[in-house]
From Swiss-Prot:
Gene3D superfamilies (UniProt xref): Sodium:dicarboxylate symporter
Gene name of this polypeptide: dctA4
Gene Ontology CC entries for this record: plasma membrane
Transmembrane segments: 20-40, 53-73, 90-110, 160-180, 209-229, 233-253
Name used for this protein in its record: C4-dicarboxylate transport protein 4
Family named by the database record: Belongs to the dicarboxylate/amino acid:cation symporter (DAACS) (TC 2.A.23) family.
Presence of the UniProt keyword Transcription regulation in the record: no
Length: 442
């Protein structure tokens, strides 16, 4: 089937600063922090604003993923090419994810953020994490894998389970590709539906500043900035590790691929600020698909790599899992041998898959990992409850950057990247990023 052309060249434009999306979101985040700090009770009442925005985006995630993956596979035509792109993606995801897990372990061993806490697990009240522990114990590795299979085709989309939607999308894409010319009308109809869904997303994203304001006001109002000071060592270590991972590991990968990681970050600044405000990378999945296409990446590759990366390429979550696990071991004076640490890394390689970009998913995944590791008391995750919300932003930001880099790298490896579009974008990342805002008329 014919490859649908990449979107037309970007028309750069200038507009008043107060109309620029990232400026609006940044102001909203600052106002949210101030409201939450000075008027915590009022800040907590603003939670529906953040929840409402996330819910609006989440209602579009399943149909957007379905359309992009199905069209991405069916438009490739050559099923060997589909398999090649899929295999390259999985190898890349697993390699970089393993590096992220190892980096978390290494930094945790070197900096020892949990040293000196001397917490007795018997004194920890497990009630605050009972829900997470129960959910983690119910979802063993086999149950986790079996949960990928939905009860029904429509049910997967209705529930919005990312892995289930991916499964039916991949199967549908292959089925349409097998139909040959007879499948082209179906692929075209799905492409038209995708355009409609992206149009809805553009409308929803206009209220992103309101969502970011409400989410940040609630976070600061409910948990307080004081909780940050109590566990500043862990928070600081995690943020530092994530920044170094992005600049050094992802930076090296980007340099080898022929672009600057800093310019790439500038290009997706709007999406990063929305993620910062909402703590969920899922809120910008549709925008990332469009931005990667405008960057010059092939539409079919983007349609495969970005959605699957949201389940299988979670660099920030991986760093958090091994670093937080070591922190809890150190804080409870639980000695781990090198073999036990390697065992944690191996278990985390499995449990981290499918921890989608939903806010709080990293904490549930950590509980699932600890439920399989008998050495560290699982109730010790109660120590992290008060600060997890502040760490979820960093997880989501790192996940988002990692997925964008993966998409560019795999497009290059397939010879499916428009180098001229990439170089133009990297030369003017701020201006071009601004031109792609909702209503920007790219």
């Amino acid at each position: 089937m014919t490859q649908i052309a990449i979107q037309p060249a970007i028309r750069r434009r200038h507009q008043p600063w107060y109309k620029i999306l990232y400026v609006q979101v940044l102001i909203a985040i600052v106002l949210g922090v101030l409201i939450g700090y000075f008027y915590p009770d009022f800040g907590k009442e603003l939670k529906p604003l953040g929840d409402g925005f996330i819910a609006l985006i989440k209602m579009m995630i399943a149909p957007v993923i379905f359309c992009t993956v199905v069209h991405g596979i069916s438009s490739m035509g050559d099923l060997k090419r589909v398999g090649r792109v899929g295999l390259k993606s999985l190898i890349y995801f697993e390699s970089v994810s393993t590096v992220a897990l190892a980096v978390g372990l290494l930094v945790g061993e070197v900096l020892q953020p949990g040293h000196g806490f001397n917490i007795d697990p018997a004194t920890i009240d497990p009630k605050s994490v009972a829900t997470y522990v129960t959910k983690a114990k119910e979802e063993g590795i086999v149950a986790h894998l079996m949960a990928i299979i939905p009860d029904s085709y429509v049910g997967a989309i209705a529930r919005g389970d990312l892995l289930q939607v991916l499964l039916i999308s991949i199967l549908s894409g292959f089925a349409i590709a097998f139909l040959g010319k007879a499948g082209e009308p179906i692929a075209d109809a799905i492409d038209k539906a995708a355009k409609m869904f992206f149009g809805i997303i553009r409308i929803i994203v206009r209220v992103a500043p309101v969502g970011a304001f409400g989410a940040m006001a609630f976070t600061v109002g409910a948990y307080g900035l004081g909780s940050l000071l109590n566990l500043a060592a862990l928070i600081g270590t995690f943020y530092l590790t994530s920044i170094l991972f992005v600049l050094i590991v992802l930076g090296a990968i980007a340099r080898l691929a022929g672009f600057s990681i800093l310019r790439f970050i500038a290009y997706i600044k709007d999406e990063l600020l929305i993620v910062l405000g909402t703590s969920s990378s899922e809120t910008v999945l549709p925008q990332m698909i469009q931005k990667m296409e405008h960057l010059g990446a092939s539409r079919s590759v983007v349609g495969l790599v970005i959605p699957t990366g949201y389940s299988f390429n979670l660099d920030g979550t991986n760093i958090y899992m091994t670093l937080a696990t070591l922190f809890l071991a150190q804080a409870t004076n639980t000695h781990l041998t090198i073999w036990q640490e390697l065992g944690i890394l191996g278990i985390a390689m499995i449990t981290s898959k499918g921890a989608s970009g939903v806010t709080g998913a990293g904490f549930i995944t950590l509980a699932a990992t600890l439920s399989i590791v008998p050495d560290i008391p699982i109730q010790s995750i109660a120590i992290l409850v008060g600060i997890d919300k502040f760490m979820s932003e960093c997880r989501a930001l790192t996940n988002l950057i990692g997925n964008g880099v993966a998409c560019v790298v795999i497009s290059i490896s397939e010879g499916e990247l428009d180098r001229d579009a990439l170089h133009e974008t990297m030369a003017h990342p701020l201006e071009i990023g601004e031109a792609l805002e909702p209503g920007g008329g790219a």
